[in-house]
Amino acid sequence: MPEPAKSRPAPKKGSKKAVTKAQKKDGKERKRSRKESYSVYVYKVLKQVHPDTGISSKAMGIMNSFVNDIFERIAGERRLAHYNKRSTITSREIQTAVRLLLPGELAKHAVSEGTKAVTKYTSSK
């Protein structure tokens, strides 16, 4: 009597294997495009603020959308550099854009954190 085929145990929920190549119809392998996201950085900030708190993949997707949206809005304020006949957006233009885009207290916190980050960066050079 033939032995029943051994089946592999089902992978644990949430575990994902990195697939770098996908099989094409004609047998050739092609590289799968990489999706860029801010999830690594969002996770690092979360652990700095609340070390014992986790985040779901759905919430991470929302945070990624939020960061992309804010980035696009700040980049959209490039007219601030254009007014001064400049082709480069400096930290000053970004600061002004943040003040225009974010409401009240949120803008104040964002500006202070941004200033702190720029100061840390320039002092490390």
Swiss-Prot record:
The modification N6-butyryllysine is found at residues 6, 21. The modification N6-acetyllysine is found at residues 6, 12-13, 16-17, 21, 24, 85. Glycans are attached at residue 112. Residues 9-19 have a biased composition (Basic residues). The modification N6-lactoyllysine is found at residues 6, 12, 16-17, 21, 24, 44, 85, 108, 116, 120. The modification N6-glutaryllysine is found at residues 17, 35, 44, 47, 108, 116, 120. The keyword Cell inner membrane does not apply. The modification N6-(beta-hydroxybutyryl)lysine is found at residues 6, 12, 21, 35, 116. The modification N-acetylproline is found at residue 2. The modification Dimethylated arginine is found at residue 79. The modification N6-(2-hydroxyisobutyryl)lysine is found at residues 6, 13, 21, 24-25, 35, 44, 47, 58, 85, 108, 116, 120. The modification Phosphoserine is found at residues 15, 37. The modification N6-methyllysine is found at residues 47, 108. There is a cross-link at residues 6, 21 (Glycyl lysine isopeptide (Lys-Gly) (interchain with G-Cter in SUMO2)). The modification Omega-N-methylarginine is found at residues 86, 92. The modification N6-succinyllysine is found at residues 35, 116, 120. The modification N6-crotonyllysine is found at residues 6, 12-13, 16-17, 21, 24, 35. The modification N6,N6,N6-trimethyllysine is found at residue 85. The modification ADP-ribosylserine is found at residue 7. Monoubiquitination at Lys-35 (H2BK34Ub) by the MSL1/MSL2 dimer is required for histone H3 'Lys-4' (H3K4me) and 'Lys-79' (H3K79me) methylation and transcription activation at specific gene loci, such as HOXA9 and MEIS1 loci. Similarly, monoubiquitination at Lys-120 (H2BK120Ub) by the RNF20/40 complex gives a specific tag for epigenetic transcriptional activation and is also prerequisite for histone H3 'Lys-4' and 'Lys-79' methylation. It also functions cooperatively with the FACT dimer to stimulate elongation by RNA polymerase II. GO terms for molecular function: DNA binding; protein heterodimerization activity; structural constituent of chromatin. The modification N6,N6-dimethyllysine is found at residue 58. Pfam families: Histone. Belongs to the histone H2B family. This is Histone H2B type 1. The lineage of its organism: Eukaryota, Metazoa, Chordata, Craniata, Vertebrata.
